[in-house]
């Protein structure tokens, strides 16, 4: 299992809480890796994603590396509040991966107070905001992901 960490935009503000919850509640034999891939070479990223069964990541370009994951793998995409553009879902479907989404809750940024329909609000005040994730929702999506990976990738039914 790979959990992507971001350090500029769409930072999960309670990332350490999320990691602790995932590590302490993980009852599977999946290896657990938390990583920021921005400084990794392209080759290192391909190698990392090729051996990833489950990816947990905030909405962003890092999810395009799913193209290197094997069919039957699973993606948990975490959306910032008010951002629902599911372009990576289409990619995941085409790659024969399974998918869960977690929509975070919160407020729009101050960029949206003056003109809520502006591009500044859409990008800076919505898509690129740092946010808190609902840890319970991620754990639920991960539980679903475990079952799907075991079934679709390894042909094993688990409950």
Where are the regions a protein language model picked out?
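The feature primarily captures lumenal catalytic ectodomains
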Residues: 1-159
